[in-house]
Regions:
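Residues lining hydrophobic/aromatic ligand-binding pockets adjacent to catalytic sites
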Residues: 1-158
Length: 158
């Protein structure tokens, strides 16, 4: 696959990374309107108590207008979500082989205060690609020549 157009996600589903690894160039769609209750702000992990949802709180538009994906801001006032996510990952995976090799990088992601949701997505994406020892060329804006195929819709949370 030459190019792929994807919605940025928080710890994207594995199907999205499979599609990314099969493409030469990834374009993250940022000009679309943000949709609630998608993988853009949430991911699922396996914890000692079963499947667990991790959700990134966002600031909602006060004027009732739709917000573009690139303009979505993270809400740090509602809950200490970064501590919760990091502790959940530690509880679920600390005893897993090789977790210790990734723990410092994960901690750095969760200690950083990302202003925009997409900044968090980029850090997570770069972490995962580095952990997979893969390189990925990507664009942060709409790329009109991107080929949108059925496989490019995998993992969009829609």
């Amino acid at each position: 696959m030459e190019n792929i157009l994807l919605q940025p996600c928080y710890f994207s589903p594995i199907a999205q990374y499979a599609a990314i690894l099969q493409s030469k160039h990834v374009c993250f769609e940022l000009a679309d309107h943000f949709q609630k209750q998608t993988y853009r702000t949430r991911c699922y992990i396996y914890s000692p108590n079963g499947k667990q949802l991790l959700n990134v709180p966002i600031q909602h538009a006060k004027n009732g207008k739709k917000t573009k994906t690139k303009d979505v801001k993270i809400d740090y006032q509602t809950a200490p979500w970064q501590k919760i996510h990091l502790k959940s990952l530690q509880a679920g995976y600390r005893s897993s082989p090789f977790y210790e090799y990734y723990e410092d990088d994960l901690t750095a992601i969760f200690e950083k205060k990302h202003h925009y949701l997409f900044d968090l997505h980029l850090d997570v994406h770069e972490f995962v690609m580095e952990a997979l020892e893969e390189k990925c060329e990507f664009t942060k804006a709409i790329h009109k020549s991107a080929i949108i195929s059925s496989s490019s819709k995998i993992g969009t949370g829609a």
